[in-house]
Amino acid sequence: MENLFGAKRLTATVGGKEIIMETGRLANQADGAVWIQCGGTVVLCTVCTQPLEREISFFPLVVDYTEKMYAAGRIPGSFFRREIGRPSERETLVSRLIDRPLRPLFPKGFTNEVQILANVISADQENDSDVLALCGSSAAVMLSSVPFEAPVAGARVCRIDGEFVLNPTITEAAKADLNLVVAANRDALVMVEGEADFVPEEVIAQALEWAHREVQPIIDMQEKLRELAGKAKIEFVAPEEDTELKEKAEALATADLAAALQVREKMARKEAKKAVKEKVKAALLQDPAFAETPERLAALGDILSSLEKRIVRQRILKEGLRIDGRDTKTVRPIIIEAGALPRAHGSAIFSRGETKSLVVTTLGSTTDEQRMDSLTGDVTKRFMLHYNFPPYSVGEVKPVRVSRREIGHGALAERALRPVLPSPDSFPFTLRVVSETMESNGSSSMAAVCGGSLSLMDAGVPVKAPVAGIAMGLIKEDDQFIVLTDILGDEDALGDMDFKIAGTAEGVTAVQMDIKIDGLPAEVMGRALAQAREARLHILNEMAKVLPEPRQALSKYAPQLSVVEVNPEIIRVIIGPGGKNIKAITSATGASIDIEDSGRISIFAPTKESMDMAREMVMYYDQRPELGKNYTAKVRKIMEIGAIVEILPNCEALIHISQLDTSRVEKTEDVVQLGQDVEVKVIEINDGRVRASRKAVMLEAQGVEWDPADTARPPRKPRDRDDRGDRGGRGDRGDRGGRNGRGGDRRDRR
């Protein structure tokens, strides 16, 4: 491609495909902009920053990934035909995929606003755009003036036919039994997200090590691009620590805070920590050094948080004891109630320590499938898992809305359960699982997995196997590390890793890992996976005590299902002109009917009675005429030789004029009229052609039993030309004369 704008371009081969990174062609007024391309898929990633005019205690990073419909040659389906409104679920998930590995790499204390936008501007529908957006966003930040520790490379690693493949096409990835998205820096992995079909833990560990080696060329590209076109970084100096405040606060708080951190109940511990802070603050305000400058105490919260982190970590490393008194491998007590809700199709309460979820399953028809507008066209989704995290679950007051975190946790639980679902052919219901977090003290997404599995089984969904999930943590200091099983919320915040693993007794179905430290040795990864398997098997055993297998029958409140097979040729008849027939069936019965081109019809109804009625009405259109059976037929056509009548939908028969009445009929219309209903008997079926008799029905009414021989079509008598006799001469008719009997000689008429 000709370089018209003086752009800087780099290429590299990664996973057998050429990756292009370019800057200087588009969005030159952004602080950093990168065009990243693989095949026909292009993502434009931009970074902008500006200082805030007010002081805040957090890093205001915003990441938005957007799929432009023009990228795939499509027009948005919205009313305004624009990409407006809230982002799609995929856009939200990819935005999180970019945010999670990048956010920890900005310097602590940096509070400038930073906005990262990743726009898909071309999509070939073969090369996925999510990992390109991650790589391009990292490269754009590297080029910008925003301080950033190191580049991050993203890639998809799949196992296809037993072999690892890096960044496969969308078609290839659909065949994989392991599909992971990884993000890594030069030294280690920093994020993992993916799903699997019962893959052993050892295979996942191998895939992650292999992926880290394979993504190094992408890191090289970003560093080279930075050398070619990078801007000078903002000179950021972290705020100076108030050492006097720190020393005095720690001296006042250490003993009381250590005691508060041994309170096992979450809310009581929260109150105890709050009391410690208030006590320390009151004591410091009595100190002349702070009494005159109370604004110095603004940093007290951060100082106590750092002290809390140090106390908790040291206790775990030295004593092997955690905040709630457990050792490093023990899973919190589990309590399960199946069938908790009387009217739900399936429900379960899953409680693990102070984390509790109410999970509900609802069955629907195929018309309830989620339909989405995407770059690949209109797609449908038959299984949905929605995770809700209301503010009361943590005793807080907040606006109620669906957050990105809730969407992400729901997607993780959905991936965990999807591999065990029955196929649409064997179980054509649409499935919606909702996890309502009732209480939360860590691992609520894994409670959604466990409760979701139980809820599906309670609903009678024939899952292949139960699924359980566990969240693993890590405490690492120098060369010493400890892996934690079933982490609390505080341990998640104070630890170095959040590694969620879900699966069956056979293998893993979903993983999600976020790492807060620079490197994760293979030994740590292996131990985390092994401990997670032990915990998962323990949880599955507890679940089996309550509900060892799916219910044998669906709830009486669930939709009733009947599947019938009909001749594909009569589908149009069942539907009717403009959908007239199918609408009449659904209106009369309240059923939902899904018709496939193969002739397979799924009938969903609220009750068995309405299902039976709908089935009967559908099968009415698939009837076949039976010899000797009487039918009420409608006259469709009057002919000289008889009448054409409709005896069944899409089936017509001929009533010969001789079969219209017991007496001789001169004209068909003397007996029947167009549109008239008449009682007839089928007297002949031959090669798809049907003959009927009104006469036979009339004779039966007179007590004369119908004899097929009486109404069968008489065989035609052979016509022998010799039987016609001699035509004889013309007799007294005279000569025919000339041409055409007009007399005279031909020449005479000239």
Swiss-Prot record:
Localization (cell): Cytoplasm
Cofactor: Mg(2+)
UniProt key word Cytoplasm: yes
Gene3D superfamilies given in the database record: GHMP Kinase, N-terminal domain, K Homology domain, type 1, Nucleic acid-binding proteins
Annotated binding of Mg(2+), by residue: 492, 498
UniProt function note: Involved in mRNA degradation. Catalyzes the phosphorolysis of single-stranded polyribonucleotides processively in the 3'- to 5'-direction.
Top EC class of this enzyme: transferase
PROSITE patterns: KH_TYPE_1 (PS50084), S1 (PS50126)
The S1 motif domain, residue ranges: 628-695
Residues covered by the KH domain: 559-618
Recorded family membership: Belongs to the polyribonucleotide nucleotidyltransferase family.
The keyword Transferase belongs to this UniProt entry's keyword annotation: yes
Top-level taxon: Bacteria
Name of the protein: Polyribonucleotide nucleotidyltransferase
A Pfam family: RNase_PH
Record field: catalytic activity: RNA(n+1) + phosphate = RNA(n) + a ribonucleoside 5'-diphosphate
Cross-referenced CDD domains: KH-I_PNPase, RNase_PH_PNPase_1, RNase_PH_PNPase_2
PANTHER family: POLYRIBONUCLEOTIDE NUCLEOTIDYLTRANSFERASE, POLYRIBONUCLEOTIDE NUCLEOTIDYLTRANSFERASE 1, MITOCHONDRIAL
A Gene Ontology BP annotation from the UniProt entry: mRNA catabolic process
Record-annotated membrane-spanning stretches: none
Basic and acidic residues compositional bias, start-end: 717-750
Record region (Disordered): 705-750
GO molecular function, one term: polyribonucleotide nucleotidyltransferase activity
